[in-house]
Protein backbone atom coordinates (compact mmCIF):
# COMPACT_ATOMS: atom_id res chain seq x y z
CA UNK A 1 0.00 0.00 0.00
CA UNK A 2 1.18 3.51 -0.76
CA UNK A 3 -0.36 6.67 0.63
CA UNK A 4 -0.16 9.83 -1.45
CA UNK A 5 -0.89 13.31 -0.13
CA UNK A 6 -1.13 16.60 -2.02
CA UNK A 7 1.92 18.70 -1.27
CA UNK A 8 -0.29 21.68 -0.41
CA UNK A 9 -2.30 19.71 2.16
CA UNK A 10 -2.24 21.18 5.66
CA UNK A 11 -0.77 17.97 7.12
CA UNK A 12 2.15 17.67 4.69
CA UNK A 13 4.88 18.29 7.27
CA UNK A 14 3.45 15.68 9.64
CA UNK A 15 3.07 13.30 6.69
CA UNK A 16 6.75 13.72 5.78
CA UNK A 17 7.70 12.57 9.31
CA UNK A 18 5.67 9.34 9.22
CA UNK A 19 8.70 7.14 8.66
CA UNK A 20 10.79 8.60 11.48
CA UNK A 21 12.15 6.14 14.03
CA UNK A 22 9.55 5.49 16.69
CA UNK A 23 6.62 6.22 14.41
CA UNK A 24 3.89 3.56 14.68
CA UNK A 25 3.60 3.37 10.88
CA UNK A 26 7.23 3.29 9.74
CA UNK A 27 6.50 0.67 7.08
CA UNK A 28 4.19 2.86 5.02
CA UNK A 29 5.22 3.70 1.48
CA UNK A 30 4.35 7.29 0.71
CA UNK A 31 4.33 9.88 -2.02
CA UNK A 32 3.49 13.51 -2.54
CA UNK A 33 1.36 14.83 -5.40
CA UNK A 34 2.80 18.02 -6.86
CA UNK A 35 0.71 20.12 -9.27
CA UNK A 36 2.28 22.51 -11.80
CA UNK A 37 1.06 25.68 -10.08
CA UNK A 38 2.70 24.65 -6.79
CA UNK A 39 6.02 23.83 -8.41
CA UNK A 40 6.00 27.08 -10.38
CA UNK A 41 5.26 29.10 -7.23
CA UNK A 42 8.14 27.34 -5.50
CA UNK A 43 10.51 28.04 -8.41
CA UNK A 44 9.36 31.66 -8.48
CA UNK A 45 10.49 32.12 -4.89
CA UNK A 46 7.57 31.30 -2.55
CA UNK A 47 9.58 30.77 0.64
CA UNK A 48 6.99 28.59 2.41
CA UNK A 49 6.84 26.26 -0.59
CA UNK A 50 10.62 26.20 -0.79
CA UNK A 51 10.77 25.10 2.86
CA UNK A 52 8.31 22.28 2.19
CA UNK A 53 10.20 21.26 -0.98
CA UNK A 54 13.46 21.19 0.99
CA UNK A 55 11.80 18.86 3.53
CA UNK A 56 10.57 16.60 0.71
CA UNK A 57 14.08 16.38 -0.76
CA UNK A 58 15.68 15.87 2.65
CA UNK A 59 13.25 13.03 3.37
CA UNK A 60 14.05 11.45 0.00
CA UNK A 61 17.75 11.66 0.76
CA UNK A 62 17.39 10.09 4.22
CA UNK A 63 14.64 7.52 3.59
CA UNK A 64 14.20 7.20 -0.18
CA UNK A 65 10.67 8.55 0.24
CA UNK A 66 8.35 10.22 -0.48
CA UNK A 67 7.88 9.33 -4.11
CA UNK A 68 7.16 12.46 -6.12
CA UNK A 69 4.11 12.36 -8.37
CA UNK A 70 3.75 15.29 -10.76
CA UNK A 71 -0.04 15.31 -11.08
CA UNK A 72 -0.50 17.63 -14.04
CA UNK A 73 2.36 16.10 -16.02
CA UNK A 74 0.89 12.63 -15.57
CA UNK A 75 -2.58 13.72 -16.64
CA UNK A 76 -1.26 15.65 -19.66
CA UNK A 77 0.51 12.51 -20.85
CA UNK A 78 -2.04 9.84 -19.95
CA UNK A 79 -3.30 7.48 -22.66
CA UNK A 80 -5.84 8.92 -25.08
CA UNK A 81 -8.51 6.48 -23.90
CA UNK A 82 -8.30 8.05 -20.42
CA UNK A 83 -8.41 11.56 -21.91
CA UNK A 84 -11.47 10.67 -24.00
CA UNK A 85 -13.30 9.24 -21.00
CA UNK A 86 -12.37 12.13 -18.68
CA UNK A 87 -10.53 9.77 -16.32
CA UNK A 88 -8.22 11.45 -13.81
CA UNK A 89 -5.04 9.91 -12.44
CA UNK A 90 -4.77 11.05 -8.82
CA UNK A 91 -1.86 9.02 -7.44
CA UNK A 92 0.23 5.95 -8.11
CA UNK A 93 1.34 2.73 -6.49
CA UNK A 94 4.20 2.20 -4.05
CA UNK A 95 6.94 2.59 -6.67
CA UNK A 96 5.19 5.18 -8.84
CA UNK A 97 5.36 3.12 -12.03
CA UNK A 98 1.61 2.59 -12.40
CA UNK A 99 -0.60 5.36 -13.75
CA UNK A 100 -4.22 4.30 -13.49
CA UNK A 101 -7.33 6.39 -12.89
CA UNK A 102 -9.31 6.27 -9.68
CA UNK A 103 -12.57 7.71 -8.44
CA UNK A 104 -14.53 7.68 -5.20
CA UNK A 105 -16.12 4.42 -6.43
CA UNK A 106 -13.03 2.76 -7.90
CA UNK A 107 -9.64 2.44 -6.24
CA UNK A 108 -7.08 1.24 -8.74
CA UNK A 109 -5.22 -2.00 -8.31
CA UNK A 110 -2.77 -3.76 -10.59
CA UNK A 111 -1.16 -7.19 -10.46
CA UNK A 112 2.57 -6.82 -11.21
CA UNK A 113 5.51 -9.09 -11.74
CA UNK A 114 8.95 -9.03 -13.36
CA UNK A 115 11.07 -11.28 -15.54
CA UNK A 116 14.73 -11.45 -14.48
CA UNK A 117 17.01 -10.38 -17.35
CA UNK A 118 19.95 -12.19 -15.77
CA UNK A 119 18.10 -15.39 -16.67
CA UNK A 120 16.96 -14.18 -20.10
CA UNK A 121 18.75 -16.97 -21.99
CA UNK A 122 16.79 -19.51 -19.94
CA UNK A 123 13.35 -18.10 -20.81
CA UNK A 124 13.76 -16.19 -24.09
CA UNK A 125 12.59 -19.04 -26.35
CA UNK A 126 9.90 -20.35 -24.02
CA UNK A 127 6.32 -19.44 -23.20
CA UNK A 128 7.40 -17.98 -19.82
CA UNK A 129 6.08 -14.49 -20.61
CA UNK A 130 2.71 -15.90 -21.66
CA UNK A 131 2.55 -18.06 -18.53
CA UNK A 132 3.47 -15.09 -16.34
CA UNK A 133 0.56 -13.11 -17.80
CA UNK A 134 -1.79 -16.05 -17.22
CA UNK A 135 -0.50 -16.27 -13.64
CA UNK A 136 -1.10 -12.55 -13.04
CA UNK A 137 -4.60 -12.86 -14.46
CA UNK A 138 -5.26 -15.83 -12.16
CA UNK A 139 -4.10 -13.77 -9.16
CA UNK A 140 -6.48 -10.99 -10.19
CA UNK A 141 -9.32 -13.50 -10.61
CA UNK A 142 -8.69 -14.85 -7.13
CA UNK A 143 -8.67 -11.32 -5.70
CA UNK A 144 -12.02 -10.64 -7.37
CA UNK A 145 -13.46 -13.91 -6.06
CA UNK A 146 -12.18 -13.54 -2.49
CA UNK A 147 -13.25 -9.91 -2.10
CA UNK A 148 -16.86 -10.43 -3.12
CA UNK A 149 -19.02 -8.96 -0.38
CA UNK A 150 -16.07 -7.27 1.37
CA UNK A 151 -17.20 -3.68 1.91
CA UNK A 152 -13.68 -2.41 2.64
CA UNK A 153 -12.30 -3.71 -0.66
CA UNK A 154 -15.37 -3.04 -2.80
CA UNK A 155 -13.84 -0.08 -4.67
CA UNK A 156 -10.70 -2.09 -5.50
CA UNK A 157 -12.81 -5.07 -6.56
CA UNK A 158 -14.93 -2.85 -8.79
CA UNK A 159 -11.78 -1.52 -10.49
CA UNK A 160 -10.41 -5.04 -10.94
CA UNK A 161 -13.65 -6.20 -12.56
CA UNK A 162 -13.80 -3.25 -14.97
CA UNK A 163 -10.12 -2.87 -15.89
CA UNK A 164 -8.20 -6.11 -15.12
CA UNK A 165 -4.90 -4.20 -14.96
CA UNK A 166 -1.84 -6.43 -15.29
CA UNK A 167 1.81 -5.48 -15.64
CA UNK A 168 4.81 -7.60 -16.53
CA UNK A 169 8.18 -5.89 -16.61
CA UNK A 170 11.83 -6.78 -16.35
CA UNK A 171 14.40 -6.46 -13.61
CA UNK A 172 18.17 -6.38 -13.90
CA UNK A 173 18.36 -4.00 -16.88
CA UNK A 174 21.36 -2.10 -15.51
Residue ranges and their predicted role:
Residues 60-67, 71-174:
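Function-dense linear segments that define catalytic or interfacial modules
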Amino acid sequence: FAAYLDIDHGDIEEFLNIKEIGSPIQNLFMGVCVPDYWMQDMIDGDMEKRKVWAKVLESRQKKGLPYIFFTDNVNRNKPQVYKDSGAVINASNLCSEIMLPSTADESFICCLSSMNLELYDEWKDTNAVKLAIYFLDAVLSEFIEKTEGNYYLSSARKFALRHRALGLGVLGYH
